Amino acid sequence: MTEKPHNKPECLNFSSGPCTKRPGWSVDILKNASLGRSHRSPEGKLKLSIAIDLTREQLEIPDDYKIGIVPASDTGAIEMAMWNLLGSRPVEVLSWEVFGKDWKKDVEEQLKIPGSTYHDVEFGIIPDLYKINFDNDIIFTWNGTTSGAKVPNADWIPNNRKGLTLCDATSAVFAQDLDWSKLDATTFSWQKVLGGEAAHGILILSPRAIELLENYSPSWPIPKIFRLTKNKKLIEGVFRGETLNTPSMLCVEDYIDALEWVKSIGGYQGTIKRADHNFSIIKKWVDQSNWVDFLCESEENLSNTSVCLKFSNNLSELNEVDQRAFAKAIGKLLNDEKVAYDIVNHRSAPPGLRLSLIHI
């Protein structure tokens, strides 16, 4: 029998969202939050603008890109991008994990954009990136949060593309190197990677996206909470911290603290190094394991932050129901032993384990 290990992680929180807080986090960091004040007050606006400015600074986002704080986490941000920006041309939808497949469903069944192409593949691989028609708009997840498979870089996106690129980067920012020149609408949430609180999203728009917003009106109605233009002009206030609905100023303070921590360790390059280091430890263990393997089949596409593991050898011969039961049993055991929390993969993904790595 295998001897029970004695060493345990210093941090037990491996959830992929909400993710663990940064090292040394304490509720005391919230003492300067703008509580009981309107988010429209000078103090509230200042806090929101600080959050936007720090986001730009720490992700090195170009000055001519707009950054907005929007409702409903990354889901709200990517839906806002889709409902405002898509429809002027067909869409190339790339989907290889749970959330990308959700965005595929939106384009195919809700927006019903004619002429669209669906590059849908199974968990563990990504579509052929060199079969994409860039005369069309593109939507993709940079990092597959539920499959552990990411795009290797942005080299496959041409500079002279005609369509827009919409990128769900919610578990990629601060963990992987994004090329902003290749991205026209990029989204993420505070709860992923940074360990922020839920319900708030970030929408980043390129000049090309802004130009389309001001010159194109979708054929479908846009709900008030999604509207980014008025009289065919960008609502600039959204990108100065004048949010479309009321944000939690407590969550804003927490997000600012997370960004200040990123700054203290060298910006996003520092968090990438941290994620890479943590991933190297997991990879060494997986390479030596006789019962788990990476769900992602390609070394080039292995995620360093949303690590998804499948069962191998005899365990892989179990049916799906039994594999899911086994994953839950492992999750419960590690929870009860206070070794790891929240490591069972998403219910819509193949059975296995999932670990989020940056702060750990």
Provide a role label for each language-model segment.
Residues E122-F174, A185:
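Active-site phosphate-binding strand-loop segment of PLP-dependent enzymes
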Residues M1-P42:
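N-terminal "arm"/small-domain region of PLP-dependent enzymes with the aminotransferase-like
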Residues H359-I360:
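Conserved small/polar residues in nucleotide/adenosyl-binding loops
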Residues D28-M80, N84, W96-V98, D102, ...:
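Conserved N-terminal alpha-helix of the aminotransferase class I/II PLP-enzyme fold
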Residues D293-L333:
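Conserved PLP-binding catalytic core of the aspartate aminotransferase-like
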Residues G76, N84-I138:
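PLP-dependent aminotransferase-like
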Residues L54-P62, E260-C296, L333:
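Conserved PLP-dependent catalytic core of the aminotransferase class-I/II
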